Swiss-Prot record:
Gene: nusG
Name assigned to this protein: Transcription termination/antitermination protein NusG
InterPro entries in the cross-refs: KOW, NGN, NGN-like_dom, NGN_dom_sf, NusG-like, Rib_uL2_dom2, Transcrpt_antiterm_NusG, Transcrpt_antiterm_NusG_bac_CS
Family membership: Belongs to the NusG family.
This protein's record includes keyword Metal-binding: no
Cellular-component GO terms for this entry: cytosol
NCBIfam families, A to Z: nusG
Length: 192
């Protein structure tokens, strides 16, 4: 019976094929673990086995202490993505970093992400960044001007913000009566 090693199980490891893998980490330790992996790769001269290490984050503007500051939010807290050639040696390099709890997949064989899965992660990251950027543009009670649709040029007051759907509930005056309408973020602009 042959030994159950990654080199024996995964044919890709012999062809130097790099694929994306998900690594589970200790909470809040993603940056330190990424730096530790990069240091260990350089120290062990294994740069040929690794192509990229990503922490899926997006920038968000928040008000802290009365100032608008940019902070990073994690799309997948406690996870990092590594594009690597999975061999016994590269697996052990990552697995033995303090704070790494394991790869996604079985304990013996990590599961590589498919192209559609990795594309989905990148699309979600892009969408979250867009939502975060746009949702901070408007505040409840703010006066906005409708720029698109049947109520174009109407002015209204933001009543609610739905970040998940990229929509605002805006109260506009129609025939002297306040009427709530739902609009996309890109259908309004801040009034001067």
């Amino acid at each position: 019976m042959t030994e159950q090693t990654i080199d024996n199980i995964l044919p890709a490891s012999k062809n130097n094929v790099k694929q994306w893998y998900v690594v589970h980490t200790a909470s809040g330790a993603e940056k330190r673990i990424k730096e530790d992996i990069l240091r260990k790769i350089a120290k062990q001269k294994m740069t040929d086995f690794f192509e990229d290490i990503l922490i899926p984050v997006f920038g968000v503007s928040e008000v802290k202490r009365g100032k608008n500051v940019k902070v990073e939010k994690k799309l997948m807290p406690s996870y990092i993505l590594i594009k690597m050639n999975m061999t016994d040696k590269s697996w052990h390099l990552v697995k033995n970093i303090p704070g790494v709890t394991g790869f996604l997949g079985s304990k013996i064989v990590p599961k590589a992400l498919t192209e559609s899965e990795i594309q989905n992660i990148f699309n979600n990251l892009e969408a979250e960044a867009k939502v975060a950027k746009n949702s901070k543009l408007y505040e409840v009670g703010e006066i906005v001007t409708v720029t698109d649709g049947p109520f174009e040029t109407f002015m209204g007051t933001v009543e609610a913000i739905d970040k998940a759907r990229n929509r605002l509930k805006v109260s506009v005056s129609i025939f002297g009566k306040a009427t709530p309408i739902e609009l996309n973020f890109n259908q309004v602009k801040k009034s001067d």
